Amino acid sequence: MERKLGPEFESCVKSGRIRRFSPGPTFVAGELAAASQDLDEARRTLAAGGLKWATIQAYYSMFHSARALLYARGYRERSHRCLVIALRELYVGPRLLELEFVEGLEAGKTLRENADYYSRFSEAGSRQAVELAGSFLARARTLTSEPVRPT
């Protein structure tokens, strides 16, 4: 039985912030590669003491992991908020992805914004962001290696 998509997701579709994107699955590998590269850079930057940039790079690793998941389902996003809504709808709702990963993405976004816009960052926050990014990438790789039919 096919699930009815929720009103927040439908609102994102209606506003054009989530769109059908049939070539999406062909972009998954590139997004995962970008996530991996950002994660590697975040780890190097953190090891060198660059807390602000490590936080920002870790968030973008999570963003690319999330985007890979969306592409795998044949959609693309035009807003970070709708990306989160789409992950909840397409992956968390049907119990394909644990909520902790979406909450981690949201926490990572807050850490990135604080670092980027307000120069507020810490070693603990940077380490948390890098750890979250590594876990999210591993989970996205697992999910995209399994056949997932477009919704």
Locations of regions flagged by a protein language model:
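Terminal alpha-helical segments
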Residues: 1-151
